[in-house]
């Protein structure tokens, strides 16, 4: 990144805004501080020079070079650059400097300008619009639009619809455009390798500035800041670089990578140029220009979606306060604050703001405008959005738009821009579905409807065709439209919409339509439509109208030959046959003359991409079929036969003549062949050079006359190894064939893509082989033509001019290439020179169609980028342009023709499939007829068989045939049964899914409608009356009904309750934690000591310690007992109430009694205070509601059980009556008819009494239901099949229910019959026996009379029994009915109460949130008050403890002085001195405690500066004259007293320091107490205010509850409010008082009377008790005084004086003495140990002494011997000397010195021995004082003696 070093002086004066000033200042600071490679240094060239080199290398514009070297004459020279020594040099551009447009833009490439002019094609007009390109609609002024069309920018005047074109400079496309805020400049960001951004001035359209090196491949978006001095750009893949430009200086200011995925947009914040925003694929990022220590940087913060789903963000807007409002894919608005989503905005009901993505968001005049893919523009309130915030966990906030404009459901708004028209609020909108709209967003009563200014194709253009007669062209695309244009007059004429997208198109030749009015279009669903174009002005229908369209399209024919998209259409050269090709691998032929009657089709080995009939020069009519997968077929023209369609079974053409060429890749062979040729040419050149060199050498030899010249070594180059030839390569996937054309009969040229691109291949069909397999066939082309620069850019389409001298090629990258050919050159020998120019977009603008006009004056192209271009072809003849094309006149009678029925269903049958379906239906019809005939025959045979069976039954038994005799063959029956079972299994398998589906459906219905029911309505009828009783229809209680919210249902405890529950021991455990921890640590240490081995001394010491501990513990227990007793006395005295003490509870009770005495406070009273236990909330009310429902449900369930029991009783009664009636019938058969009593009618069961049987069914019921349903469906029409089936289902259900009830009746009858038979069997009735008639005897007559009497009695008994059963049942029913009526009344009251409770619950829920807030505040303040009160109590306790400690320390200090005074005794003359020593103040170093705090560090620093640990100071009480020295004990002063004074002084200082510390702690505690007390008062005030607020809110809630209407039924005797003895009409002023409350008040009177008598009795008893206690107190006082006197006498008798018994009890041991004893014991043990050690050392030293003595003795003996020998030698020597002369006399000096040394050594050793003996003696004594050994220093070290 390169940054400017200084600012342009011309611009610097004009920039006055705050942001620009900041930016310039930061840039200067950056340039002055940054020394990285991005900034300029001395001697480094500016990037302009580098760019010039690159431009020169790329053969691009030379304007920059001219700018550096010499300016053009038309340009003003740039401002001269002042060169300063040792300073950076920077080019400064003048404001009047412009680049040269002709030298800047890209120009066509011409291989040879001699044959082809440079401007062979000139852009005439653009009919397309890349509507899916982001921000591809800009407004330059009120009439001019700017948008990108391929490699051009189009300036469109939408008033007169003229166009101006600006060509790109790179020739590789344009990425983005942006307009200056002042509309004086616009930026064009291009594509290519390191593309440029060119700033054009408007309206002059001069290139003003060029920005370089901002992206690697292409730009995605550019945007000017609000002031227009900065430009932001963002690149596409792969770098995604965001750059901030100072565009007037052509300098990049900041640069960084924006993101790692596609970035859609970058914009400046309109209110702050230092903030930017980018958005793109799955992200949004917020940028800020920050000044860091390394300079000005661009820092980005990536937006975090959090819980929100990640979304691609197309549109956003920066709000003035720094927030950003963005859209989302699902249509909601996201409000960003910082880098987080603050809130997600949606519409009411959780509906999205737009149905689809939001593509643009704008701020305009305090409103937010959003445009979405749903075709709607919505206006939102800015303040609502700016202040939006989340209200719940969903993160959503519901808002509604202020205004809304819905354009159309087929509109997809991609971007919008406002028109600057005064007084209007017009906007231009880019529709991604192919339109530019003008919208009026004023939303007033004169608002205009949306106006479509321009309409285009949306997306890639699929096909283009031109009229063979005039300047008309037709296009189609996947946007389901067909459009016709007049490209000569530059006007779109007409367009027509369909349901499916168009994929191919052809204009019918004049041989088909003389007026060239027919257009054939193929669609993606396989349909082919023939459209007729005509001029409607010639119709009589439009006669007299003013606005008549220029052209109309009429659907003439429609047919569907294919099942997939139609990819190719071709008319035979005579126009007799139309051929269609498709992706479904079929070619279909139609007879054009017979209204496109289908001829037939055949299959191909691959999807078809092109069809071409042989030209007229070929002898035969053949069709060239090019498939995508490498197959090229040739078919003869099919013969047209007059065959009736009804007789044709299939349209497949049999025995079709096909020749196939299966293309095999030969590119690697061609490359190998070309390489071989190149090497051969190189060899030939080398040989030629060798020959020339030899000839030259021969000439030189002749010139010099030399005979032989050595030959040059020329074989070096030949000996070099050549690289290997390219390998033969076959691509794994065959290369697709893109296009092709005939050259000669049986020969053709093809262009391929992928690997085989770069050549045109000349191929020839092999000879025809019948039944050959195309898959196994492999063919290679026999010739090829090399195409320059098409390795990665193959030819997509090829067309020729009418005279075949120009070949127009449409390239894959959107370029046009024109080859100039010779006449009659089918082999393309002259394919060398060409004209090449990029027109469409290089990335996605592949040319789909290219064709010339009928007279070769125009060339038309259509690309996948949605652009349609018309070019003027260079011609030597001047042809008039702009002539309006003639639209064909309408045919006669066209207006009266009925339009054919269109095929709109994409799943409709194709022609072949429809024919197959028809044949299949015919076949199935014949099969069904045959089956019906067979069934009729079988039916006849079956009837005959049944007749035979009937005849067989009529025969006698012995003559009848058995059923098995009719079986002809058992195997046949077994086989039939087997097949039947297999068929059943198969059917079950086939219907398993349906079965499970219906079972699940039934289960779901039952779960939905029957499962929730606990009991259905059961109606029980009486038998002898019309009375009936119905049960309740109950739903099962929900499992969630009993749940409650414990946090809300719990009532806040009152203060009294809390105080009672807490008790005195609250938080005491917090105190004891430290002690418990320390005890635990001590126990751990003690456990650790057990593992160490103990010595005897340790055991003795521990025993002594244990004894002392026991004594101390005994004394501590006594002391603890005394203290406990004192504490109990203190508590007892503290609990003693004062004489005027009153119990607070009694006071409160008396106060409440006085307040509410004689007053029953109503809830409607304004001062009504709700007690805490009566406060209600939503949860409690919900519990009441649940309890009421439970109670009502329980009562209803109990009543249902009773009714069900009654129903069961009726069933039992009916069963018994049926048995009795059957028995009655049997009895009446035995008595005369005259004595028959009428048989009682048996009660019947109604369907309402057994509703559960409605859902019981059997197979017969289901079959009947199916038959009924089928009949109803047959009767209903096909259009009303849905409603009809529903109605039939309902009717069937009713019939099914009726059938079910009938079946139940049968079952009941059957059951009754069975029961009657059982009853008769039990009664053992005599069966009638048939006898022959005879005269009865007298005995028989007597028996008959007796039986008759018996039967008559039984008849009467049975009738009575039946009557009794019915009457009893009816009585039970009446009784239960009466109970149910009462329960119904209660249930109605319950429902009314339920309604009231529900209303109260809803009201309480509204109050719940605020109440919870107030309650939470009260609870928090209450808890805070309790905590502070506890802190106060704790502080008071600590203060009391510290005061006790201070008192103890003061007592210790007094005791210290008293003890020292006693030690001094009387008349001690050093008393004053010693007292001064004791009282002297000394500065001591502060002791570092183990458990230090934060202040110890400072104390340690201060103590480290002290010179010594003790430093004397003067006594404060004395004067300066009283200075004395306390370091030396005075003469005659007792040393022990002096030492005691020093020790006690240390103790005094310790006590004083402790006192100071304790007083500091007390002061701190007082301060803390005061602070907390103040806080308690504040909290108490706040608590009272909060409780009052809560109480007021409770009153408000109660008042709102009182406003609810409650229904209370009253009887007249309950009304006691009478006026003149009558009930008044208006009862609004009455009070409804419950009996329960009234009874309670009356009971309260009795209770109070009883309580009064009880209290009087208790008062009397308390007075008697008080008198008794006073008497006992006097007696106890006398007893205590007697006991005190006895104790005093005992003390005097035992101790001689009165002593302190407590001190005596606590006196156990003298701890100091015991400690000294333990120290003494330890010292003795250590001394004994040390004594043993010294004894061992003495023994060792004695041994060493003895050894040394022996050695010394030995040495002395040696010395003695040596001395004797020396003496002898001396005497001999003396003798010799005396003989020689007496020169020397006496001993030598050396001998004297040696002798003295030996003597001293002996003396020293003797002294050591004496000292050691004394020390040994001393150590042997017990109490001897051990002194250091005497080691006398030797004066001189012993030197070795000379021998």
Swiss-Prot record:
Modified sites of kind Phosphoserine: 1069
InterPro entries attached to this UniProt entry: Beta-prop_EML_1st, WD40/YVTN_repeat-like_dom_sf, WD40_repeat_CS, WD40_repeat_dom_sf, WD40_rpt
Keywords for the protein's UniProt record, in alphabetical order: Cell projection, Cilium, Coiled coil, Cytoplasm, Cytoskeleton, Flagellum, Phosphoprotein, Repeat, WD repeat
Compositionally biased region (Acidic residues): 41-58, 705-724, 1492-1524
GO cellular component, one term: motile cilium
BP GO annotations: cell morphogenesis; cilium organization; flagellated sperm motility; microtubule cytoskeleton organization; nucleus organization; sperm axoneme assembly; spermatogenesis
WD repeat ranges per the UniProt record: 214-255, 258-297, 308-346, 353-390, 456-495, 497-541, 561-600, 790-829, 842-881, 1699-1744
Main location: other
Region (Disordered): 1-86, 701-726, 1040-1086, 1266-1291, 1488-1524
Coiled-coil region(s): 1548-1603, 1631-1665
Record SMART domains: WD40
Organ and tissue specificity: Expressed in testis.
Pfam families per record: Beta-prop_EML (PF23409), WD40 (PF00400)
Gene3D superfamilies registered for this protein in UniProt: YVTN repeat-like/Quinoprotein amine dehydrogenase
GO molecular function ontology, one term from the record: peptidase activity
Disruption outcome: Mice are viable and show no malformations. However, homozygous males exhibit complete male sterility due to severe defects in sperm mobility. Sperm from mutant mice is characterized by normal flagellum length, but most of them showed abnormal forms and irregular caliber of the midpiece. Females are fertile and give litters of normal size.
Entry function: Flagellar protein involved in sperm flagellum axoneme organization and function.
Protein name: Cilia- and flagella-associated protein 44
Organism field: Mus musculus
Encoding gene, per UniProt annotation: Cfap44
């Amino acid at each position: 990144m390169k940054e400017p070093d200084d600012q342009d002086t011309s611009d610097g004066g004009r920039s006055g805004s705050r942001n620009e000033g900041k930016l310039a200042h930061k840039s200067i600071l950056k340039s002055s501080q940054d020394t990285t490679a991005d900034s300029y240094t001395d001697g480094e060239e500016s990037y302009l020079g580098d760019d010039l080199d690159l431009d020169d290398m790329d053969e691009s514009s030379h304007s920059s070079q001219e700018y550096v070297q010499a300016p053009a004459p038309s340009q003003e020279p740039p401002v001269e650059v002042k060169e300063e020594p040792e300073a950076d040099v920077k080019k400064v551009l003048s404001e009047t400097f412009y680049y040269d447009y002709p030298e800047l833009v890209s120009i066509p490439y011409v291989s040879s300008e001699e044959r082809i002019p440079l401007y062979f094609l000139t852009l005439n007009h653009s009919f397309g619009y890349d509507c899916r390109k982001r921000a591809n609609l800009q407004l330059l002024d009120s009439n001019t639009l700017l948008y990108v069309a391929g490699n051009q920018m189009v300036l469109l005047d939408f008033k007169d619809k003229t166009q101006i074109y600006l060509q790109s400079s790179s020739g590789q496309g344009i990425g983005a455009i942006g307009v200056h805020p002042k509309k004086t400049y616009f930026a064009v960001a291009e594509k290519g390798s390191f593309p440029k951004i060119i700033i054009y001035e408007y309206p002059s359209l001069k290139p003003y500035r060029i920005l370089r090196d901002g992206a690697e491949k292409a730009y995605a978006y550019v945007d000017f800041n609000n002031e227009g001095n900065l430009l932001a750009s963002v690149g596409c893949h792969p770098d995604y670089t965001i750059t901030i430009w100072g565009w007037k200086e052509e300098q990049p200011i900041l640069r960084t990578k924006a993101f790692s995925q596609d970035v859609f947009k970058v914009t400046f914040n309109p209110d702050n140029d230092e903030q930017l925003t980018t958005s793109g694929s799955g992200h949004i990022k917020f940028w800020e220009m920050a000044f860091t220590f390394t300079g000005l940087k661009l820092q980005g913060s990536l937006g975090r979606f959090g819980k929100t789903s990640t979304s691609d963000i197309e549109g956003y807007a920066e709000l003035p306060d720094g927030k950003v409002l963005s859209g989302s894919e699902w249509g909601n608005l996201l409000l960003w604050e910082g880098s987080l989503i603050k809130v997600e905005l949606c519409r009411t009901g959780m509906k999205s703001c737009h149905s689809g993505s939001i593509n643009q968001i704008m701020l305009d005049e305090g409103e937010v405008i959003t445009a979405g893919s749903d075709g709607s523009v919505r206006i939102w309130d800015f303040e609502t959005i700016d202040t939006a915030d989340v209200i719940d966990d969903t993160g959503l906030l519901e808002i509604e738009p202020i205004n809304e404009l819905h354009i159309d459901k087929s509109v997809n708004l991609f971007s919008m821009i406002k028109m600057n028209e005064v007084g209007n609020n017009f906007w231009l909108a880019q529709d991604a579905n192919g339109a530019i709209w003008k919208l009026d967003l004023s939303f007033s009563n004169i608002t205009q409807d949306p106006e479509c200014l321009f309409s285009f194709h949306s997306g890639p253009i699929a096909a283009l065709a031109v009229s063979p007669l005039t300047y008309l062209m037709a296009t189609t695309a996947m946007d389901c439209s067909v459009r016709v244009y007049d490209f000569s007059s530059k006007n779109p004429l007409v367009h027509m919409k369909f349901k499916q997208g168009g994929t191919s198109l052809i204009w019918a030749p004049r041989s088909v339509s003389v007026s060239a009015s027919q257009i054939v279009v193929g669609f993606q669903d396989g349909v082919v439509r023939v459209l007729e174009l005509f001029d409607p002005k010639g119709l009589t229908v439009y006669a007299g109208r003013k606005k008549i369209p220029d052209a109309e399209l009429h659907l003439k024919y429609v047919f569907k030959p294919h099942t997939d998209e139609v990819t190719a259409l071709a008319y035979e050269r005579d126009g007799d046959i139309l051929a269609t090709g498709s992706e479904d691998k079929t070619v279909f032929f139609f007879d054009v003359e017979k209204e496109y009657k289908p001829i037939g089709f055949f299959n191909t080995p691959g999807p078809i991409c092109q069809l071409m009939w042989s030209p007229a020069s070929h002898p035969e009519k053949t069709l060239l079929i090019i498939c995508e997968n490498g197959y090229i077929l040739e078919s003869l023209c099919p013969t047209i036969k007059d065959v009736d369609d009804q007789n044709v079974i299939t349209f497949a053409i049999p025995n079709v003549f096909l020749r196939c060429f299966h293309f095999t890749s030969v590119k690697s062979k061609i490359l190998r062949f070309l390489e071989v040729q190149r090497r051969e040419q190189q060899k030939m050149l080398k040989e030629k050079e060798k020959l020339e060199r030899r000839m030259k050498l021969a000439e030189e030899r002749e010139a010099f006359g030399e005979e032989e010249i050595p030959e040059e070594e020329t074989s070096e180059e030949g000996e070099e190894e050549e690289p290997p030839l390219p390998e033969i390569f076959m691509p794994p996937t065959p290369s697709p064939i893109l296009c092709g054309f005939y050259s000669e009969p049986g020969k053709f040229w093809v262009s391929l893509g992928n690997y085989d691109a770069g050549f045109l291949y000349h191929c020839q069909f092999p000879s025809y082989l019948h039944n050959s397999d195309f898959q196994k066939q492999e063919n290679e082309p026999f010739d090829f033509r090399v195409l320059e620069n098409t390795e990665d850019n193959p030819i997509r389409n090829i067309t020729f001019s009418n005279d075949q001298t120009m070949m127009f090629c449409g390239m894959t990258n959107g370029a046009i290439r024109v080859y100039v050919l010779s006449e009659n050159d089918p082999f393309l020998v002259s394919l060398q020179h060409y004209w090449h120019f990029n027109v469409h977009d290089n990335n996605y603008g592949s040319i789909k169609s290219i064709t010339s006009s009928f007279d070769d004056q125009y060339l038309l192209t259509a690309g996948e980028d949605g652009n349609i271009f018309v070019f003027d072809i260079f011609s030597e003849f001047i042809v008039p342009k702009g002539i309006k094309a003639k639209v064909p006149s309408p045919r006669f009678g066209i207006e009266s023709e009925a339009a054919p029925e269109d095929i709109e269903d994409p799943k409709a049958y194709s022609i072949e499939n429809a024919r197959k379906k028809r044949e299949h239906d015919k076949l199935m019809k014949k099969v069904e007829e045959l089956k019906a005939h067979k069934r009729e025959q079988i039916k006849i045979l079956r009837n005959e068989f049944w007749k035979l069976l009937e005849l067989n039954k009529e025969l006698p038994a012995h003559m009848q045939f058995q059923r098995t005799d009719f079986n002809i063959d058992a195997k046949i029956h077994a086989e039939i049964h087997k097949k039947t079972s297999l068929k059943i299994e198969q059917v079950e398998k086939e219907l398993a899914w349906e079965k499970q589906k219906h079972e699940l459906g039934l289960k779901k219905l039952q779960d939905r409608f029957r499962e929730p029911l606990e009991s259905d309505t059961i109606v029980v009828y009486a038998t002898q009356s019309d009375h009936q009783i119905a049960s309740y229809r109950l739903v099962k209680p929900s499992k969630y009904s009993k749940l409650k919210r414990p946090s809300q249902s719990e009532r806040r405890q009152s203060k009294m309750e809390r105080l009672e529950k807490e008790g005195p021991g609250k938080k005491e455990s917090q105190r004891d934690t430290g002690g418990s921890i320390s005890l635990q640590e001590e126990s751990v240490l003690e456990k650790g000591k057990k593992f160490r081995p103990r010595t005897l001394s340790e055991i003795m010491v521990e025993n002594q310690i244990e004894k002392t501990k026991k004594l101390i513990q005994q004394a501590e227990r006594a002391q603890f007992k005394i203290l406990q007793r004192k504490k109990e006395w203190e508590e007892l005295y503290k609990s003693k109430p004062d004489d005027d003490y009153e119990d607070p509870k009694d006071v409160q009770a008396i106060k409440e009694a006085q307040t509410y005495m004689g007053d029953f406070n109503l809830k409607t009273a304004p001062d009504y205070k709700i007690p805490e236990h009566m406060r209600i909330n939503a949860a409690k009310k919900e519990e009441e509601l649940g309890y009421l429902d439970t109670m009502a449900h329980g009562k209803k369930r109990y009543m249902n059980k009773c009714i069900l029991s009654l129903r069961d009783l009726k069933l039992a009664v009916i069963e018994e009556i049926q048995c009795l009636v059957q028995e009655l019938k049997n009895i009446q058969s035995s008595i005369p008819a005259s004595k028959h009593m009428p048989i009682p009618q048996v009660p019947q069961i109604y369907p309402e009494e057994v509703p559960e049987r409605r859902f019981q069914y059997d197979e017969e019921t289901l079959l009947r239901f199916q038959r009924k349903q089928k009949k109803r469906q047959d009767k209903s029409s096909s259009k009303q099949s849905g409603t009809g089936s529903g109605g039939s289902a309902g009717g069937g259900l009713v019939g099914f229910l009726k059938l079910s009830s009938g079946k139940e009746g049968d079952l009941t009858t059957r059951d009754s019959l069975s029961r009657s038979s059982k009853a008769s069997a039990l009664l053992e009735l005599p069966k009638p026996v048939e006898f022959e008639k005879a005269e009865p005897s007298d005995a028989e007559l007597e028996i008959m009379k007796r039986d008759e009497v018996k039967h008559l009695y039984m008849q009467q008994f049975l009738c009575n029994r039946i009557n009794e059963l019915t009457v009893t049942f009816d009585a039970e029913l009446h009784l239960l009915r009466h109970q149910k009526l009462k329960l119904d009344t209660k249930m109605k009251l319950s429902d009314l109460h339920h309604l009231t409770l529900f209303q109260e619950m809803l009201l309480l829920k509204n109050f719940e949130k605020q109440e919870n807030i107030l309650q939470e505040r009260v609870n928090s303040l209450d808890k805070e008050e309790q905590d502070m009160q506890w802190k106060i109590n704790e502080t008071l306790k600590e203060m009391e403890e510290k005061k006790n400690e201070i008192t103890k320390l003061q007592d210790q200090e007094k005791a210290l002085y008293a003890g020292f005074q006693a030690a001094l005794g009387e008349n001690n003359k050093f008393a004053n001195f010693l007292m001064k020593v004791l009282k002297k103040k000394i500065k001591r170093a502060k002791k570092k405690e183990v458990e230090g705090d934060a202040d110890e560090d400072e104390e340690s620093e201060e103590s480290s500066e002290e010179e010594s640990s003790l430093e004397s100071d003067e006594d404060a009480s004395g004067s300066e004259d009283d200075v004395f020295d306390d370091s030396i004990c005075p003469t005659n002063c007792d040393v022990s007293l002096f030492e005691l004074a020093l020790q006690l002084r240390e103790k005094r200082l310790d006590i004083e320091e402790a006192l100071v510390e304790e007083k500091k702690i007390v002061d701190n505690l007082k301060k803390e107490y005061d602070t907390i007390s103040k806080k308690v008062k504040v909290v108490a005030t706040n608590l009272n205010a909060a409780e009052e607020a809560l109480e007021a809110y409770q009153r408000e809630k109660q008042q709102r509850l009182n406003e609810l209407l409650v229904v209370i039924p009253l009887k007249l005797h309950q009304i006691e409010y009478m006026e003149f003895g009558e009930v008044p009409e208006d009862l609004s002023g009455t009070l409804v008082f419950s009996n329960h409350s009234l009874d309670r008040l009356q009971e309260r009177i009795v209770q109070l009377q009883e309580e009064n008598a009880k209290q009087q009795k208790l008062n009397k008893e308390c007075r008697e008790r008080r008198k008794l206690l006073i008497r006992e107190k006097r007696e106890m006082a006398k007893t205590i005084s007697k006991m005190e006197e006895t104790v005093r006498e005992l003390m005097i008798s035992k101790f001689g004086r009165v002593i302190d018994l407590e001190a005596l009890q606590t006196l156990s041991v003298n701890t100091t003495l015991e400690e000294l004893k333990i120290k003494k014991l330890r010292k003795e043990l250590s001394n004994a140990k040390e004594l043993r050690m010294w004894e061992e050392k003495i023994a060792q030293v004695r041994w060493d002494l003895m050894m040394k003595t022996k050695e010394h003795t030995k040495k002395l003996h040696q010395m003695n011997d040596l001395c004797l020998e020396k003496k002898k030698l001396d005497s001999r020597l003396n003798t010799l000397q005396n003989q020689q002369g007496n020169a020397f006399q006496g001993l030598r000096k050396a001998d004297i010195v040696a002798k003295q040394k030996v003597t001293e050594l002996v003396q020293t050793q003797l002294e050591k021995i004496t000292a050691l003996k004394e020390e040994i003696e001393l150590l042997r004594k017990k109490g001897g004082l051990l002194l250091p050994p005497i080691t006398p220093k030797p004066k001189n070290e012993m030197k070795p003696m000379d021998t």
